[in-house]
Amino acid sequence: MKKRLLSLLALAAVTVTAFTACGGNGAKTNSGSAAKSNTSGAASSTKSTSTVASSAKSTTTEPVTVEFWTISLKANFEEFFNKLIADYQTANPNVTINWVDVPYDDVQSKLVTAVAGGTSPDVVNLNTQMALTLVGQDALVDLNKAATDEQKSIYIESLWNSAKVGDSVYAFPWYASPDIMFYNQELMKKGGIEAPATFDQALEKAEKFHNDTKAYLFLPDEFFNLLIEENIPILNEDRTKAAFNTQAAVDLLKKYKSYTDKGVLPKTNWGSWDEALKLFESGKLAIVSSSGSSLGRIKDEAPDIYKTIAVSTPLTGSTGLSRNPLMNLVVPKASKNQEAAIAFANYITDDANQLAFCKTVSIFPSTKKASEDSFFTSDTKTLEGQASAMSAKASLTSQDFSLGVANQGTIQAAINKAYEASIINGDDIAAALKQAEEDVNKILAENK
C-alpha cells in the first residue's frame, strides 16, 4: 500500500501545480505564494485574530505539539501567521504549534518523504484534488465524524462538500480563488468586439479577432474543466464508471480543433495559468480567467498591460458555472494529535481568521459569515477593488470542480491526455476518448 501511495502522491503533486495556494489554473510563479499581500488591511486583519483566539479552545489538556504545514506562505505572510499561532497558543497554553512552510518546489518530495518515513504532519494545507488522492489511500481523518457540529457549521455547504466522498468529508475548506475575467480593453477595441460572456460567444469571435489583432482572444480551459463547464458528465451517477466518452465530447474536441488547426486559438498549454499570464502580459492574449490575486503579478511584470485591464465575470459554458479552486486543511490519520489538530485547523479556517487573511490578499473565504462581509464589495474605485467585487459575484455561480471520488488527480490527468493526443498530437478524437475512458475506469476499479 505504501508503495502505491507514494506513486499516487507523486502524480498528485503534479496536479498541485494547477491549484496550489491562490493562483489560478496552472501557476508556478504566483500560485504557491497566495500572491503578494495587500498593504491595506494587514493591520486590521492581525488585530481581528486576537479577538477570537479565546473561543478556539482545544479540549486537549496534556502538552501537545501540532505540526502545521502550509505551501509557500511564509515569504509574504510570516507576520500574519505568527500572530495567529501566538494567539492560539496563548488561549491554549498546553498546545505548541510547529509551523512548517514547505517551498513550492519541494511539495512533492517533502510530502512523499513524510509519508514514507512515518513522520506525517498533523495539519496540512492541500488542494482538493490532492486531498482526494490521499482519501483513496485511507490516509485522512473523516472530519464529518471527527469534528463537532459547531466546527462543521461555519462553512459554505458547496465548499464543505468539495472533499466529500459518500457520507464522509475529509477537509476543512480554507480559502478559495474564484475565477474572474481580466481583459485587455485596447485589444478588444482593436478587434472591434466587446468582452464575450460565454465560450460559445468567444469562439464565434475568435477568428475575426485573431485576424484583426494577431492576438488570441482566449486560451481554452483544460479539457477536464471544459467537460464540466459544458455539462458533459465525467462519471456515471454512482461514480463507478466513466461517462464522458460521448458524441458530445467528440463534438466538443472537434469544435475546438477546428480553431487550433487554423491557428486562431493556441494548440498547447490549455488551462495553464502561467502560460496565459505570459501571453496576456506580452499583449498576445486578450482574456485571462484567473483569481484576483493575479493582478499583483501583472502589475509588477507588465505595468503597461495592467493599465489596459477591465474585469468581468469569467467565460462559462452551458452550465453557467465557473471554477473556484479551493485550498483546504486536512488532518492525516497518521497524526498522533488528531483532536488538537482538528481544533487548530478549525481555528485557522474560522470566520474571523479567514476574513483577516482575505484582507491581506485577493482571495475569498469558505465560511458563510465571512463571505457576506461588506469588505468584498465596498471598494470599486480601484482595479483591485473591482476584482474583489467581481470575485464575490462570480463565487455565487462557481464551484470547486470536485468529482467526490478518491484519486481525482489521476482521473483528471487521464482525461486531459485525450486533449493532448487529439489536439496536440493529431490522433483520432474518438480513439483518444476511448483510451481515456479505459484509463479512468481502471482508476475507479482500483478505488474500490
Where in this protein do the model-derived segments appear?
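Extracytoplasmic "Venus flytrap"/periplasmic binding protein-like
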Residues: D87-Y155, S162, E186, K190-A197, ...
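Long, aromatic- and glycine/proline-rich binding clefts that accommodate carbohydrate-like moieties
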Residues: S312, T360-A413, A421, N447
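Bacterial lipoprotein signal-peptidase II cleavage site
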Residues: F19-A42
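Hinge/lid segment of periplasmic solute-binding proteins
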Residues: P103, N127-I180, L203, F209-N211, ...
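Extracytoplasmic/periplasmic substrate-recognition and gating elements
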Residues: A86, T90-A91, K254, S258-L265, ...
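Periplasmic solute-binding protein
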Residues: L134-A139, S158-E194, L219-R239, L253, ...
